[in-house]
Amino acid sequence: MKIINILFCLFLLLLNSCNSNDNDTLKNNAQQTKSRGKRDLTQKEATPEKPKSKEELLREKLSEDQKTHLDWLKEALGNDGEFDKFLGYDESKIKTALDHIKSELDKCNGNDADQQKTTFKQTVQGALSGGIDGFGSNNAVTTCGNGS
């Protein structure tokens, strides 16, 4: 009976020591998981990049003159919805429209230039309200250079 008691005590000690190792292992695993989580969070925080708007994507493809006239057009259209609609058109048509605006505004000089540019803004607003397909030399022409 004594031997059984001694063996039983040894068994309990052995079982207890195994359990304590498992606790340490669990604690280490928990700490490693937390540190991995922190590492992952820092990586996730560094990588999220705000998607670029249509305007930013278009600006990357435009020349400096075209960017200037895009700003002018944004101001002319005023309503964000109209400008967003304009940005939805085909890139080549947008570039053609901006080049047309540049050529027309280059004609405006002299005493009445500011008044003529304001009138041209209104003309552009009206021309673009029907879409970009008809925009150009037919319906978006300034009175600049007509001798006035």
From Swiss-Prot:
N-palmitoyl cysteine lipid modification positions: 18
The induction text for this entry reads: Strongly induced when grown at 35 degrees Celsius.
Membrane topology (UniProt): Lipid-anchor
Keywords from UniProt, A to Z, are:
Cell outer membrane, Lipoprotein, Membrane, Palmitate, Plasmid, Signal
- The answer to whether the entry has keyword Electron transport is no
Q: Which InterPro entries match?
A: Mlp
Q: Where in the cell is it found?
A: Cell outer membrane
Recorded GO cellular component terms are: cell outer membrane
Pfam families for the chain: Mlp (PF03304)
Q: Where is the signal peptide?
A: 1-17
Highest taxon, organism lineage: Bacteria
Extract the ranges annotated as region (Disordered): 26-58
The primary location reported for this protein is membrane
Q: Where is the composition biased (Basic and acidic residues)?
A: 38-58
**Residues anchoring lipid (S-diacylglycerol cysteine):** 18
Keyword Cell inner membrane: yes or no?
no
| Protein function | An outer membrane protein that may participate in pathogenesis. Some human Lyme disease patients have antibodies against this protein. The Mlp proteins probably undergo intragenic recombination, generating new alleles.
UniProt family annotation: Belongs to the Multicopy lipoprotein (Mlp) family.
Protein name stated in the entry: Lipoprotein MlpA
Q: What is the lineage of its organism?
A: Bacteria, Pseudomonadati, Spirochaetota, Spirochaetia, Spirochaetales
